Structures are given as C-alpha cells and as structure tokens.
C-alpha cells in the first residue's frame, strides 16, 4: 500500500502532462473547409441527409443512423434551426455556441459554454462553433470533436441549408484552422 501511495502523485502528474488539450495524441488528419448541404428533418424525403456526423466529417441520413451530432430543420414559423442532440431527445450530448467572430477568424474551439438544450436559430451568415457527442478517442480517453460553421444559404422552397464547415476530425483537438492541428 505504501508503494502505491508513494508513486500515485507521480502517476497523476504524468497523466495530466500527457493529456493536455489533445489528450496526449498526435493529430493525423489535416483540417479543411468543406461546403455541405442538409435538408430539413420535416417535409423532405427521408433519403435526403438532414444531419451531420462530426467524427466522419459528413452529412448523414437520420433513418436508421442515429450517430449524428446535429440536425437541420425548419419550424412551423419558418425559422431555420440547427438541433443538437438535446432537443431531439437523444441526450444532452452535443451543442453549439454562436460566434461574433468571422468564420476565418476562429482559430480554436472554446472549452465550454456550449448550449446542449435548445435549437440554434440560424440565418444566412450565422457563424457557430459545434461540439460533438462525447466519444472515446484512440488513446482510450474521453474526448469530443469540434467544428466551426458558416451558413451560406437557406432555400425555403427545397428546405435546404448550405454551409461551409471546418470539422476537426482529430479526436480531442480543438484547432479550427486549415492544416494539421497542434491542439
């Protein structure tokens, strides 16, 4: 028992040093900006992609595929909404923050204050930062994915939202610049 207690502080210090913001792993994928379109959950064919999976960095369909981080819909009053998992009754897991910064000026995702409980009302030129559902990173530690997005257009007649998104698909990294992130 004394042996364990003697080395416990050293182990704790090593664990903290290894983790940091990137959970002690190296980034392997370069961040890039992509332009994607999502269709409203309601009043569109089920075969159209209505959600986004941040670990894949791709839009996904919601029929039979519940592993997504946020979805798009248009409510009965005509407001365009980005929905994290909370309002969809899938658990308070993913979330958004609206940003006052321009899309290109966002360099790193904040570490907290994501809205997990309610829809984000968006319009053309809305800029937001997204945090994914909690995941287990390749090193076995808990983490999340982060992305910044900029709404480019919302077409009411087709119920389609188009946005540019930079999704850091390196688990646990918060860097939101083009290229391989360092943190």
Question: In which residue ranges do the predicted regions lie?
Answer:
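Surface-exposed, beta-sheet-biased, low-hydrophobicity segments with strongly acidic/polar composition
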Residues: 19-183
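Sec-dependent bacterial lipoprotein signal peptides
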Residues: 1-17
């Amino acid at each position: 028992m004394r042996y364990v207690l003697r080395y416990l502080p050293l182990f704790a210090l090593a664990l903290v040093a290894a983790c940091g913001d990137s959970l002690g792993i190296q980034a392997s994928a370069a961040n890039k900006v992509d332009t994607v379109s999502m269709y409203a959950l309601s009043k569109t064919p089920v075969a159209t992609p209505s959600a986004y999976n941040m670990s894949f960095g791709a839009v996904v369909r919601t029929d039979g595929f519940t592993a997504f981080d946020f979805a798009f819909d248009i409510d009965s009053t005509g407001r365009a909404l980005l929905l994290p998992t909370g309002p969809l009754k899938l658990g308070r897991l993913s979330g958004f923050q609206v940003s006052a910064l321009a899309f290109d000026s966002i360099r790193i995702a904040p570490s907290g204050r994501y809205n997990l409980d309610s829809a984000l009302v968006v319009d053309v030129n809305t800029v937001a930062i997204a945090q994914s559902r909690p995941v287990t990173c390749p090193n076995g530690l808990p983490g999340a994915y982060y992305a910044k997005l900029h709404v480019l257009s919302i077409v009411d007649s087709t119920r389609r939202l188009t946005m540019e998104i930079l999704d850091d698909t390196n688990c646990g990294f918060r860097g939101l610049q083009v290229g391989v992130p360092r943190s």
